[in-house]
Amino acid sequence: MDIIEILEHLPHRYPFLLVDRVLEIEPGKSIHAYKNVTINEPFFVGHFPHHPVMPGVLIMEALAQAAGILSFKSMDEKPSPDTVFYFAGIDEARFKKPVMPGDQLHLHIEIERQMRGVWKYKAEARVDGQLAASAKLMCAKRDL
């Protein structure tokens, strides 16, 4: 899935769109996407000027965005002005390796369960095959 299709499945835009490409998706099961991390990211201006590291909360947000794509594809839907997916929870978040400019952050998401508009996922972010972060994520679909 290229950036054009990603933009059709996520409401996020620059500077907050954190998924560049989807490599593999199995609706109802899993997604493998990535984010190219460059020194041009606006958050590197202050985090940290002499030792740039991607903030952990943005790694979690990138994982949540990939989970959102998976959810929309699993429902065979696209975002609408009447519906929103809220990032509803994070459990067991762990940060194992700093993510730096030049890294390609691979986002791996598996659906653990979905019930009544609430989705739970197992999420991992990897750089060069090494675990950078992991968490259990929860999102909730709500009508506006």
UniProtKB/Swiss-Prot annotation:
Gene3D superfamilies the UniProt entry points to: Hotdog Thioesterase
GO biological process: fatty acid biosynthetic process; lipid A biosynthetic process
GO MF assignments: (3R)-hydroxyacyl-[acyl-carrier-protein] dehydratase activity
Cellular localisation: Cytoplasm
UniProt keyword list: Cytoplasm, Lipid A biosynthesis, Lipid biosynthesis, Lipid metabolism, Lyase
Domain of life: Bacteria
UniProt keyword Lyase, yes or no: yes
Active-site annotation: 47
Function description: Involved in unsaturated fatty acids biosynthesis. Catalyzes the dehydration of short chain beta-hydroxyacyl-ACPs and long chain saturated and unsaturated beta-hydroxyacyl-ACPs.
Protein's UniProt name: 3-hydroxyacyl-[acyl-carrier-protein] dehydratase FabZ
Organism for this UniProt entry: Dechloromonas aromatica (strain RCB)
